């Protein structure tokens, strides 16, 4: 089929879900639907359920749920407050719903992370028979200064790995039959200045990849088969060009921050991105070749992106082929499509959607 649909959310109000059509023969992108959702619940990170019948959203002060009947028929069904801490839902705090992960195996629970202040807990939601977010069944503790920004399951969905950006560590939990989780342990990031933001896992379950936001690097971990804890291999790869000025001369603040890491559908390649903190600078996207066991064989490229990426620059490989990868930015509001062919990355299409806060992560519907 030459036509594919992607859904994208926004960082700021008004809330909306944008459906974009990609034609892989004519190499075009076009906006086909803007679905209005609750005004104050823009979705900065969205995820499909296992069947792509529901979208779950990290929506400012809420966790939201939408039935997906077709690419252009998306219906809001539920919004749940952040109940892990009484202060989190207050309009006077900066606590924000930042990430969620939908289980692919029964009981299909959804795992949600707040960020900024009062973010020391993760939340687990059960779902209805149709996949709607239903009940907050667990609020499990990390630590008071935690700020989880990304999580991933191992292939068996027995172990959950969390990237704690603010506490600078990786956490490991075991999933119970109920969908709730219990703590196994945590490991500090290799460097005090790393701040892990995102994690991805190889299909073998043997290797974990941690993207370090402040460290602007990708660190490789092997999973200890006895403890299921990640062990740093001392292999890391740059997500901004080595030697580039990385800090503002006047303020000392970082000029770049790494964003997202994701594997291609075959598990043979992996993409990772970084953003710039000034609009006059560019972000970067890297590609890696993975060995069959999951270790990183080599870094293939580190290409500049057209803009800084803003809050985004999120890479989103399609889930049926290694050929297509989408990147979103919210500096200018672009969705761009890249082709990965013969280990070269080139842009084949782009569409600009000049709406407030567009665009956050893109998810592939078909």
Annotated model-derived regions:
Residues 2-4, 51-53, 105-108, 156-158, ...:
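Short coil/turn segments that connect the beta-strands within blades of beta-propeller domains
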Residues 8-12, 57-60, 112-117, 162-165, ...:
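Conserved beta-strand positions in repeat-built beta-propeller and related beta-rich domains
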Residues 19-28, 65-74, 124-133, 173-180, ...:
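Short loop/turn segments immediately following beta-strands, especially the blade-tip
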Residues 30-107, 300-302, 306:
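Blade-loop segments of beta-propeller domains
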Residues 35-40, 80-84, 89-92, 139-145, ...:
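Surface loop/turn motifs at the tips and blade-to-blade linkers of beta-strand repeat domains
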Residues 47, 101, 152, 200, ...:
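Conserved beta-strand position repeated across blades of beta-propeller domains
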Residues 73-154:
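Asp-box/WD-like beta-propeller blade repeats and closely related beta-sheet repeat scaffolds
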Residues 253-327:
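Loop/turn-rich, solvent-exposed surfaces of beta-rich toroidal or solenoidal domains
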């Amino acid at each position: 089929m030459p036509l594919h649909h992607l859904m994208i959310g926004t960082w700021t109000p008004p809330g909306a879900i944008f459906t974009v059509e990609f034609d892989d023969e004519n190499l075009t992108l076009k906006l086909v639907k803007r679905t209005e959702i609750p005004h104050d619940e823009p979705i900065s990170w969205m995820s499909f359920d296992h069947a792509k019948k529901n979208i779950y959203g990290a929506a400012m002060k809420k966790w939201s749920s939408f039935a997906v009947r077709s690419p252009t028929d998306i219906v809001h069904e539920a919004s749940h407050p952040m109940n892990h801490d009484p202060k989190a839902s207050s309009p006077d705090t900066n606590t924000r719903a930042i990430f969620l992960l939908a289980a692919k195996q029964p009981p299909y629970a959804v795992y949600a992370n707040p960020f900024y202040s009062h973010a020391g807990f993760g939340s687990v939601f059960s779902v209805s028979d149709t996949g709607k977010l239903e009940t907050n069944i667990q609020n499990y503790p990390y630590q008071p200064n935690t700020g989880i920004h990304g999580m991933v399951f191992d292939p068996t969905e027995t172990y959950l790995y969390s990237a704690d950006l603010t506490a600078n560590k990786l956490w490991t939990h075991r999933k119970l039959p109920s969908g709730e989780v219990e703590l196994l342990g945590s490991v500090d990031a290799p460097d005090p200045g790393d701040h892990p933001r995102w994690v991805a896992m190889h299909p073998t379950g043997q290797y974990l990849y941690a993207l370090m936001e402040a460290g602007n690097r990708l660190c490789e971990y092997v999973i200890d088969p006895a403890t299921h804890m990640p062990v740093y291999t001392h292999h890391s790869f740059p997500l901004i060009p080595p030697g580039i000025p990385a800090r503002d001369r006047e303020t000392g603040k970082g000029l770049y921050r790494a964003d997202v890491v994701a594997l291609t559908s075959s598990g043979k390649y992996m993409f990772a991105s970084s953003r710039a903190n000034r609009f006059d600078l560019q972000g970067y996207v890297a590609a890696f070749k993975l060995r069959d066991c999951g270790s990183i064989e080599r870094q293939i490229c580190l290409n500049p992106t057209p803009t800084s990426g803003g809050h985004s620059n999120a890479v989103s490989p399609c889930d049926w082929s290694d050929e297509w990868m989408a990147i979103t930015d919210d500096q200018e509001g672009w969705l761009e499509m890249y082709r990965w062919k013969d280990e070269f990355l080139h842009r084949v299409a782009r569409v600009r959607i000049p709406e407030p806060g567009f665009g956050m992560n893109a998810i592939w519907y078909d």
